[in-house]
UniProtKB/Swiss-Prot annotation:
A motif (VQ) lies at residues 50-59. GO terms for biological process: defense response. InterPro entries: VQ, VQ_8/17/18/20/21/25. It holds the Pfam family VQ. It is found in: Nucleus. It comes from Arabidopsis thaliana (Mouse-ear cress). This is VQ motif-containing protein 25. The keyword Nucleus applies. Keywords: Nucleus, Plant defense. Plants over-expressing VQ25 display enhanced disease symptoms after infection by the bacterial pathogen P.syringae. PANTHER family: F16F4.1 PROTEIN-RELATED, VQ MOTIF-CONTAINING PROTEIN 17-RELATED.
């Protein structure tokens, strides 16, 4: 008898435990109902009037009406954009700006051209790159860079670049 009780406990432990007050919920399938407000009619039309008929039944506007109205809207929008551009240009002028946030044309040219634009065409931000000119020329001596113009200059200066990473030995192999 004890063996049967032990077997019952073992089988109940292996099944999923369910709370005493739990129950399964079954969902009913939704019912699809078609309700006709008015009796369906067969409407006969030709191909030329089909689009107009569909648009009138669905409540969408006709293309001919919107095509007449669109150019006016586009013209008004274009006119507004032009006016906005003119107004922003006027606001950029020094007399219309705050001193903290507005730079006049001379300050802008000095910032970009450097030295008030006299004789310099590279720009004010490029002035510091002159220090790197020698560094960029020395890059040609390194044979591991896959630049064709640098490889050509390295092979011509093989005696001067032989002390760096094998110099002409590697550049001759890959050239």
């Amino acid at each position: 008898m004890e063996a049967t009780i032990f077997e019952k406990r073992r089988s109940s432990l292996s099944s999923i435990a369910v709370h005493k007050q739990s129950y399964s919920i079954t969902k009913s399938k939704p019912k699809i109902r078609i309700i006709h407000i008015f009796a369906p009619e067969i409407i006969k039309t030709d191909v030329a009037n089909f689009r107009e008929l569909v648009q009138s039944l669905t409540g969408k506007p006709d293309d001919q009406r919107t095509s007449k109205a669109k150019p006016r809207r586009d013209m008004h929008r274009l006119h507004r954009q032009v006016q906005d551009m003119i107004n922003t240009e006027k606001l950029r002028e020094p007399e219309h700006c705050d001193q903290e946030f507005c730079l006049n044309a001379e300050e802008l040219s000095m910032t970009w051209n450097g030295n008030n634009g006299a004789g310099e065409s590279s720009g004010g931000f490029l002035n510091g790159l002159g220090d790197f000119e020698g560094f960029i020329q020395e890059l040609g001596e390194f044979p591991y860079l896959p630049l064709s113009s640098i490889d050509a200059s390295a092979s011509s200066n093989s005696s001067s670049s032989s002390h760096l990473h094998g110099g002409s030995v590697f550049s001759d192999q890959f050239a």
